[in-house]
Amino acid sequence: MAPVPATQTFLAGEKVTASKLIAATKTPIDFLTNPPRCNANSSGVSLTSGTSTLVTLDAEAWDTDNMHSTAANASRITINTTGQYLVSFYARFPSNSTGYRQLNLRLNSGGSATGGSTWSTINVAAVNGSSTFVTRTLELSCVAGDHYEMFA
């Protein structure tokens, strides 16, 4: 996907023709109606109590900006277009009567639970008799080249 398009200006007194108006508006409108976005997911991750586990995302529902690969670095969502992003991450844990369930979203961690920077950590008490759901949505200023990974 191309970077956020620059807007075109018109000079005072310049005649606005259909072709100039289309050239000035089509690319920005196309960008706004199809922004960069990605929905990658995973199923059946095995976790060890007390250990942060990198979550590998083995499937995609959509990816409009080549932000995820199921073959290389499948745990990463890589930003290719700088801008504001609405980032949601979610996990469902099986029923259990003890402890807490944790999700940690990290920036540029390189696959390490202690690498890079923590953007969000969520701790939720386990629910006995029902699944425990952990979710968070954040608005982030993202820079092209950065990557995000989730640990559970």
Residue ranges and their predicted role:
Residues G83-F93, V134-R136, D146-A152:
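Extracellular beta-strand-rich recognition modules
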Residues V124-V134:
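Short, surface-exposed linear segments at secondary-structure transitions and domain or protein termini
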Residues D65-M67, S141, Y148-F151:
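Intrinsically disordered, low-complexity regions of eukaryotic proteins
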Residues A6-T9, T135-T137, C142-A144:
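Extended, compositionally biased low-complexity polar/Lys-Gly-rich tracts
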Residues T78-T82, G129-S131, S141-V143:
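Surface-exposed coil/turn segments at beta-strand junctions on protein surfaces, enriched
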Residues G99-Y100, T132-R136:
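Short, surface-exposed coil-to-beta transition loops
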Residues V4-Q102, L107-S112, S117-A125:
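Terminal (often C-terminal
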